[in-house]
Amino acid sequence: YDGGNQVMSLDEKALTELAKALEETGETALAAIAEQFKHSTRTAVATILENDDAPASVPEGYLKLHLLSHRLVQPNHTNLSGLFGVLLNVAWTNEGAIDIAELADRQIQARLENRNLSVNSVDKFPKMVDYVVPAGVRIADTSRVRLGAYIGEGTTIMHEGFVNFNAGTESTSMVEGRISQGVFVKSGSDLGGGSSTMGTLSGGGNIIITIGHQCLLGANSGLGIPLGDRCTVEAGLYITSGTKVTLLDDHNQVVGQTKARELAGKDDLLFRRNSTTGTVECLTNKIRSINLHNCKLPVTVSL
């Protein structure tokens, strides 16, 4: 190794030296794994990243996904630019990853040998738990969590929950909705059944969505702005950055109107839809936290 980001094949001699070096630094568990690799029938590969550049190869891409799922890097804190162009579309089966071009032949061969070759997915990303099972989590349907998801200890993901790569939860959360790419949910926040967060891959632009502590997205709700702490979005309400929001004080009196993006990141907000007028409303017991002087529309406030 002579510096930079490199991918190197390791023979038995190199693995022996690696195991010895790991043992000397106190990494006994990794040293034991390196020793096991010496008996593999597959080529052992070491991927070294000195710089956080965009992944230039499949091993570099998968290493970064592993760093996320091992909780060594939080979402949006490593460069994943161009990852889709680097990774290949693969059939993920009960016999491991199979090249799409070889899949039909492998299926026929399995039938001839009276074996079952089950294709779990055809994707660039495998399910996380085939490679990483973080401590202290519950995942009801493991196929709905991709490798590269960051799942904090104490998180429960129910059957309808989904977590994309480069997204996830900080700690204790109940996930029954979709956490899209780039979205990070802080501790104590819950996503109700069928709820959705807007990511940066499809339609979300470059707005990175963060959900603060102790928030709730109601069932079938949607979120396109970052939330501060202790916020609630009522069931069935989808908020985008351009949604016009009527602001109410703690006496339910209208104090102004603004776009939802102006409320991004603010604490103690409740978003709801008026069932009579259809207007999207925002309430808080801390009216000053709305910071109305930043709103683009003129408003009059009596406090």
Predicted regions and their residues:
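Terminal amphipathic alpha-helical/low-complexity segments used for targeting or macromolecular assembly
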Residues: Y1-D130, E262-L303
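Glycine-rich adenosyl-nucleotide cofactor-binding module
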Residues: Q107-H159, V163-N164, G168-S171
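Short, surface-exposed recognition loops or helix-turn segments adjacent to catalytic cores
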Residues: L80-F84, M158, T172-M174
